[in-house]
From Swiss-Prot:
InterPro entries: CDP-diacylglyc_Pase, CDP-diacylglyc_Pase_proteobac, HIT-like_sf. NCBIfam families: cdh (TIGR00672), PRK05471.1-5 (NF003986), PRK05471.1-6 (NF003987). This is CDP-diacylglycerol pyrophosphatase. The lineage of its organism: Bacteria, Pseudomonadati, Pseudomonadota, Gammaproteobacteria, Enterobacterales. The chain crosses the membrane at residues 4-24. The keyword Hydrolase applies. Its main location: membrane. Signal peptide: none annotated. It catalyses: a CDP-1,2-diacyl-sn-glycerol + H2O = a 1,2-diacyl-sn-glycero-3-phosphate + CMP + 2 H(+). The keyword Lipid metabolism applies. GO terms for cellular component: plasma membrane. It is found in: Cell inner membrane. It comes from Escherichia coli (strain SE11). It is a single-pass membrane protein. The gene is cdh. Keywords: Cell inner membrane, Cell membrane, Hydrolase, Lipid biosynthesis, Lipid metabolism, Membrane, Phospholipid biosynthesis, Phospholipid metabolism, Transmembrane, Transmembrane helix.
């Protein structure tokens, strides 16, 4: 019993330290790098010179930019043209806010252009990390390849994923996930952030503790994946963990 108690105490200490490190990372100047790129470089260059550089695309009227990430050959980021920190922002559950996940799905074409040939939809994934699972304080959705093992697991669970948020059998990458099936028409009309906030008990009050991902299934539906921070299991809710920025799935 003493050993079990000591182990539990050690886990708590590790969790607290991990949380502290995450907070420290987000309070430095480097955590504003993406915001500065968007607001001080991409947006002004588009407005003054009709050139989105260093972004790949700038859509001021639609409220977003697309930027090639330095990590990985095909990874892109979709970000707002105004200040939104992350999943904790109440703006994401405001119906007037752009449907950033749907916009990010449209932006997957940049992966194909960079690759030189079409990247199959089954190889693409979208992910946004929780407040403690991210390193940047400007909202950004990762557009990248899915890990082959995650792809296989989702394929095997196709019949187990319903139109309600339910635990995904076995979780992903050692962490618990909720999964929800959505059709394309649903996705066009309603943001995944609103689905999570309105359909999962108490999620609205704790949106910043969630990471969210989206993947297309073989039946042309989409699966939304949500994981909530749990420091006791060392889960920082970094939904980006389902992605493989080196794109092994294309080899």
């Amino acid at each position: 019993m003493k050993k079990a108690g000591l182990l539990f105490l050690v886990m708590i200490v590790i969790a607290v330290v991990a949380a502290g490190i995450g907070y420290w990372k987000l309070t430095g100047e480097e955590s504003d790098t993406l915001r500065k790129i968007v607001l001080e470089e991409c947006l002004p260059n588009q407005q003054q010179n009709q050139n989105p550089s260093p972004c790949a695309e700038v859509k001021p009227n639609a409220g977003y930019v697309v930027l090639k990430d330095l990590n990985g050959p095909l990874q892109y980021l979709l970000m707002p043209t105004y200040r939104i920190n992350g999943t904790e922002s109440p703006l994401l559950t405001d119906p007037s806010t752009p449907n950033f996940f749907w916009l990010a799905w449209q932006a997957r074409d940049f992966m194909s252009k960079k690759y030189g040939q079409p990247v199959p939809d089954r190889a693409v994934s979208l992910a946004i990390n929780s407040r403690t699972g991210r390193t940047q304080n400007h909202f950004h959705i990762h557009i990248s390849c899915i890990r082959p093992d995650v792809r296989e697991q989702l394929d095997n669970n196709l019949a187990n994923i319903s139109s309600r948020w339910l635990p995904l059998p076995g979780g992903l990458r050692g962490h618990e996930y909720l999964a929800r099936r959505v059709t394309e028409s649903e996705l066009v009309q309603r943001s995944p952030f609103m689905m999570l906030a309105e359909e999962v008990p108490e999620a609205r009050e704790h949106m910043g503790s969630y990471g969210l991902a989206m993947v297309r299934q073989s039946d042309n539906s989409f699966v939304l994946l949500a994981t909530q921070r749990n420091l006791l299991t060392l889960n920082r809710a970094s939904a980006e963990e389902i992605q493989d920025h080196e794109c092994e799935i294309l080899r």
